């Protein structure tokens, strides 16, 4: 079996990670003690991707939980599925990172990272054929962003040919915890561009808007935001966890989704959007699901896909439905909106169908888009970064941990390069492509 080792780092990473395990354990018929009570062979067919089978037929998540302070992990341990995790896989410090990327990446986090890697190694060794790693973390804090990216680069060193996939929560001024979020996020993106194969950008601003506008929640809590995140994570991993043909492992997904190595930041979406209480009241049709799934209001990243073009798209439909209808609807969307898909990648929309719907829904659709509009998100962070960095505000917290201003400047320019790369491919047309080649050849000559 092709196994995935899951890591969760920092407060946010552990909270959405714990929620992810609750949701997928439920989908696979596994109770909080790790015992299987399911009703379908499909639930067990690829259970080994995320779970180890321990003695006595118990299923244990292949998960490593990391934090620089014990608080969040205590609440995971005392939460509904806290007892399902392997006790040795909780690795935590006592000092905390104080929302400081440098502490997570260079000082406090660097002291803890070896003990985390020991646990990761142990998990990787119990795998039959490891396909890769997935990390849940946020980019705004200290541990998830600083130590999370440190873990990624260390794992990359040790397992260079394995896929590295992250679910990264991007900070937003609307749901802000700390004033230095733009610094932490920019330093993290600098790392993610180089060291991950696939990054799902989950954006607090978009989650907030969905709760507020679509779900009509006047005061959304983190619980409500995390409900959306876990629905999305369950959807994008459905292909990996249940038998199917398309994008059935992380590498195949990357091959379909990433046309240029640096442009691997995906915009996830989900349909139907329901609040935590009200799932079961109406069944959607395939056309409605498709319509909703491509709607800007359903995107989990606060970017408007109409401001850019899709390089590639993967869609996962879940539930019992007609494949023919799904294919027709997906073609329909592409034909009607052809200007929003780059014409120099033919067949750039792939669709998978998985028979088992998420709990409480007859059918659902998850959307993964590699759109040039994601540059809006990086621009937003970059502007906030520049505003503070110009005045060197709060910089002493970072230089005090041994960082150099140079690293900030590099991170800033790497992020701006990323934005212009997205812009370049947004403007490119099939005809021009040849001209680029010729110009390049002339320069060489």
Swiss-Prot record:
The protein, known as: Tubulin beta-4B chain
Taxonomic placement: Eukaryota, Metazoa, Chordata, Craniata, Vertebrata
Modified residues (5-glutamyl polyglutamate): 438
Superkingdom of source: Eukaryota
Gene Ontology cellular component terms for the protein in this record: axonemal microtubule; cytoplasm; microtubule; sperm flagellum
Subunit structure as annotated in this protein's UniProt entry: Dimer of alpha and beta chains. A typical microtubule is a hollow water-filled tube with an outer diameter of 25 nm and an inner diameter of 15 nM. Alpha-beta heterodimers associate head-to-tail to form protofilaments running lengthwise along the microtubule wall with the beta-tubulin subunit facing the microtubule plus end conferring a structural polarity. Microtubules usually have 13 protofilaments but different protofilament numbers can be found in some organisms and specialized cells. Component of sperm flagellar doublet microtubules.
Entry text on domains: The highly acidic C-terminal region may bind cations such as calcium.
Keywords: Acetylation, Cell projection, Cilium, Cytoplasm, Cytoskeleton, Flagellum, GTP-binding, Isopeptide bond, Magnesium, Metal-binding, Microtubule, Nucleotide-binding, Phosphoprotein
Modified residues (Phosphothreonine): 55
Residues recorded with modification Phosphoserine: 172
Annotated Acidic residues bias: 429-445
Binding site for GTP: 11, 69, 138, 142-144, 204, 226
Protein family: Belongs to the tubulin family.
InterPro entries: Beta-tubulin_BS, Beta_tubulin, Tub_FtsZ_C, Tubulin, Tubulin/FtsZ-like_C, Tubulin/FtsZ_2-layer-sand-dom, Tubulin/FtsZ_GTPase_sf, Tubulin_C
Pfam families, alphabetized: Tubulin (PF00091), Tubulin_C (PF03953)
PTM (free text): Some glutamate residues at the C-terminus are polyglycylated, resulting in polyglycine chains on the gamma-carboxyl group. Glycylation is mainly limited to tubulin incorporated into axonemes (cilia and flagella) whereas glutamylation is prevalent in neuronal cells, centrioles, axonemes, and the mitotic spindle. Both modifications can coexist on the same protein on adjacent residues, and lowering polyglycylation levels increases polyglutamylation, and reciprocally. Cilia and flagella glycylation is required for their stability and maintenance. Flagella glycylation controls sperm motility.
CC cofactor: Mg(2+)
Function text: Tubulin is the major constituent of microtubules, a cylinder consisting of laterally associated linear protofilaments composed of alpha- and beta-tubulin heterodimers. Microtubules grow by the addition of GTP-tubulin dimers to the microtubule end, where a stabilizing cap forms. Below the cap, tubulin dimers are in GDP-bound state, owing to GTPase activity of alpha-tubulin.
Residues engaged in binding Mg(2+): 69
